[in-house]
């Protein structure tokens, strides 16, 4: 088991990860810290995991479990409000902690709920997917969707604790693990990775890994993200690099209406971003090939069931949540691009490069 102190400027919290880490929550949280725990989880999280978490938090204070319907279409303010009303009915107060047990969907919904209640009560993350454990909990961004796009309403709110049980993560369906591995590969592509404790040979297309391997991967992702975000807590400057692949990826994810995972969408988004950078003479061909090679190592580009047409993808693309960071005319869209593996492309001292919409459409129409 590993414990890391994660700091966003002066906002610090402990992140404990490893096998059976939930059985050790008593050693991290003082018994009198909270008077009750409101455990929030979406319907896609197995009951066995939720009750397993509740068993150990229940040794500290009473636990109430609130479930909501899973799916991106339920990642909304109305879902948040419903959960808050139910929490208040259970006696939630300023000494209540919200415990998010689930993936990124649950983490964001619970994060927004916690940040708004009583102008902010304690938030604890228990990520149950490798994607959440290695990516979304390593950020203080909390947001929900509008009908026009992903993560358009939200704020910055740090958790008090994070507990990731790698035994639970290792027993996840391979496709779910692959979703997180796509974000790990993103970190390998966007940053120089001289100190990682694994090699490309440790990656596999079956996406079956031991708890110890996943612990190593999480440790790498923590180092990668905090090397940047410790100084850019709002992810508006250097931290924008972690949005690589997300401009087109989020649009694909929305257009597919739940048909593909977030990781699969980001994998496709990174390939399209690499091809766009190559067409703009920013990225050499061999670095585009490196994208394909790494993503194929984890089987990310195999059998992705893409069904949406380019026009529907572009409909969501123009509502990307990074709009407004730089001034653009109506013919261009800002994108995070690379000039090579580990080399973010810069434009006027920012990480957002204007890209002609016609070029984006052209690359999307070509496909993978």
UniProtKB/Swiss-Prot annotation:
- Pathway given in the UniProt record: Metabolic intermediate biosynthesis; 2-deoxystreptamine biosynthesis; 2-deoxystreptamine from D-glucose 6-phosphate: step 1/4; Antibiotic biosynthesis; butirosin biosynthesis
- Record-annotated active site: 141, 243
Q: Quote the record's activity regulation.
A: Strongly inhibited by EDTA, zinc and Cu(2+).
Top-level division of the source organism's lineage: Bacteria
* Xref: InterPro entries: Dehydroquinate_synthase, DHQ_synth_fam, DHQS/DOIS_N, DHQS_C
Cofactor binding remark? Binds 1 Co(2+) ion per subunit.
Q: Which gene encodes it?
A: btrC
Named from the GO MF annotations, one term is:
metal ion binding
How is this protein's function tied to pH? Optimum pH is 7.5-8.5.
Annotated EC: 4.2.3.124
Would the keyword Cell membrane turn up in this protein's UniProt record?
no
GO BP annotation list: antibiotic biosynthetic process; aromatic amino acid family biosynthetic process
Query: If you read the UniProt record, what top EC class would you report for this enzyme, in one word?
Result: lyase
Thermal properties = Optimum temperature is 46 degrees Celsius.
Cofactor names from the entry are: NAD(+); Co(2+)
Instruction: Answer whether the UniProt record assigns the keyword Iron to this protein.
Output: no
Which keywords does UniProt give here?
Antibiotic biosynthesis, Cobalt, Lyase, Metal-binding, NAD
Q: Where does NAD(+) bind?
A: 42, 72-75, 104-108, 128-129, 139-141, 150-151, 176
Record protein name field: 2-deoxy-scyllo-inosose synthase
PANTHER family assigned to the protein according to its UniProt record, in alphabetical order: 3-DEHYDROQUINATE SYNTHASE (PTHR43622:SF1)
Instruction: List, alphabetically, the SUPFAM superfamilies matched.
Output: Dehydroquinate synthase-like
Oligomeric state and partners?
Was isolated as a heterodimeric enzyme comprising of BtrC and a smaller polypeptide further identified as PdxT by sequence homology. Homodimer in solution.
């Amino acid at each position: 088991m590993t414990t890391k102190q994660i700091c966003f400027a002066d906002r610090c919290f402990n992140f404990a990860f490893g096998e059976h880490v939930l059985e050790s929550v008593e050693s991290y949280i003082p018994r009198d810290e909270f008077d009750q725990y409101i455990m929030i989880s979406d319907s896609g999280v197995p009951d066995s995991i939720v009750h397993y978490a509740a068993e150990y938090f229940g040794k500290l204070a009473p636990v109430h479990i609130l479930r909501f319907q899973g799916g991106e279409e339920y990642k909304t303010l109305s879902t948040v409000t419903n959960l808050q009303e139910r929490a208040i009915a259970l006696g939630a107060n300023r000494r209540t902690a919200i415990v998010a047990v689930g993936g990124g969907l649950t983490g964001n919904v619970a994060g927004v709920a916690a940040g708004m209640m009583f102008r902010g009560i304690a938030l604890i993350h228990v990520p149950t997917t490798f994607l959440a454990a290695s990516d979304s909990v390593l950020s203080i961004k909390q947001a929900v969707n509008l009908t026009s796009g992903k993560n358009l309403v939200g704020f910055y709110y740090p958790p008090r604790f994070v507990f990731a049980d790698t035994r639970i993560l290792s027993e996840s369906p391979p496709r779910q693990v692959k979703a997180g591995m796509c974000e790990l590969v993103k970190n390998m592509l966007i940053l120089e990775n001289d100190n990682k404790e694994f090699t490309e040979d440790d990656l596999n297309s079956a996406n079956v890994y031991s708890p110890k391997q996943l612990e190593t991967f999480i440790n790498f992702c923590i180092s990668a993200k905090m090397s940047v975000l410790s100084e850019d807590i709002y992810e508006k400057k250097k931290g924008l690099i972690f949005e690589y692949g997300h401009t087109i990826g989020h649009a694909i994810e929305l257009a597919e209406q739940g048909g593909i995972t977030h990781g699969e969408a980001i994998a496709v988004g990174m390939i399209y971003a690499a091809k766009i950078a190559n067409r703009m003479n920013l990225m050499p061909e061999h670095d585009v090939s490196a994208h394909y090679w790494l993503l194929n190592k984890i089987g990310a580009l195999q059998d992705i069931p893409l069904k949406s047409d380019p026009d529907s993808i572009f409909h969501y693309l123009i509502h990307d949540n990074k709009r407004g960071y730089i001034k653009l005319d109506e013919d261009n869209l800002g994108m995070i691009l690379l000039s090579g593996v580990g080399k973010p492309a810069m434009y006027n001292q920012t990480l957002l490069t204007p890209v002609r919409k016609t070029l984006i459409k052209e690359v999307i129409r070509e496909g993978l």
